[in-house]
Structure formats: structure tokens, C-alpha cells
Amino acid sequence: RTFPKKVSHFGKIKKVNREKVLRKPKDLVTAYPGHVLALDTVEKQRNGRRMYILTAIDIFSRTTFAIATRSHSSKTFAHFFYLVMQMFPYEIKTVLTDNGSEFKKCLDQLLKQNNITHYHTYPKTPKMNAHCESFNGTIQEEFVDYYVNLLFDDTTKFNEKLSQYLEFYNTKRVHYAF
């Protein structure tokens, strides 16, 4: 892989550094619903075919949203985030994602258009996005593993069942240990 080069005024060739991304502050505390929304992807494979479940969770209120797709491109995630903005009853101020390519280009453009701050976690630190990772584990254990055949056979029916599960998850399911 070649990196772009830059020539200094002395004639020496220098490597051009990549554009830096805004990292999540270590002391970030959510103060109200919509302050920080965490996004992530769950990937399932079967017979060489991949399906993706795009997930979003508001860290303060623990309100969630998810949808299954065949692609996890930046354009797909931008459309997903647009749906999230329509579904969530409050204004989103900050988005927290990992460093995946699906969170670049189109999603970044949508976030900039809506004046939403986009924080990235540090590389190889899933603990910085622990709420979303925990939700991903929960949704896989409680829902996806039971309907994995439906996920690959009929995505529309899977998404209908998923919306019913998310309604249960957001309104009736107990989230905290006693």
C-alpha cells in the first residue's frame, strides 16, 4: 500500500498523515436523552452469505433501534441513521461509533448536515462503546439466534419480528440487575 507523499521545502519526501478523527473524551458523561447515541453492526454468516443488523442505542434512556440489511455500506448506514432520527422522540446531539468504514463518508456527511458531533472510539477498545456492544450481545442471544433462518430467508419478516421484539425491549423488558 502506498501513502501519499509531500515534498518539503528542502526537497525531502515526507509521508502525509491521515485525517484525524474526533475521539470520544474519556470523561464523557451522558446528561439527557439524545446526548449520546451509540451505533454498531452485528454480522451473521451462513453458507458464505452475510447479513447485517444495524443497531443504535441511546446511552441515557437505553432506547434502542435495529434493522437487518444485506449491506453495511456507508450509504446504508446513513439511511439507517435517517430512520433513527425519525424514530427517536428527541434531538440527537452526539453519535459514538467504532472506526469501521461503514461510519465514514455518507454517514459523516449526514451528521455534518445536521450539526451532530461524531465521536470515534479508540482502536481495539470495544469497552468504550460498551452499551452498544452489550445490546448487540443481548439481541443476538434473545432474538437473532432464534430467527437466524428467517434472517437469511425473508429479511422483511425478520424486520417485522425485530420491531416487535424492540417494542418489548424498549417498554417491558427489565434492564437492570436487582
Regions found by a protein language model. Give the residues of each.
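Active-site beta-loop-alpha junctions of metal-dependent nucleic acid enzymes
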Residues: 49, 66-90
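An active-site-proximal beta-strand-loop segment
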Residues: 33-65, 71
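Basic, flexible linker segments flanking DNA-binding modules
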Residues: 1-35, 109, 125
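RNase H-like two-metal-ion nuclease catalytic core shared by retroviral integrases
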Residues: 97-112, 118-142, 156-157
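Short catalytic-loop micro-motif centered on adjacent basic/acidic residues
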Residues: 67, 93-98
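Basic nucleic-acid-binding interfaces
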Residues: 94, 117-121, 152, 164, ...
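Short, charged, surface-exposed loops that flank catalytic or proteolytic processing sites
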Residues: 146-161
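Charged, gly/pro-enriched flexible loop segments at helix/strand junctions
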Residues: 160-178
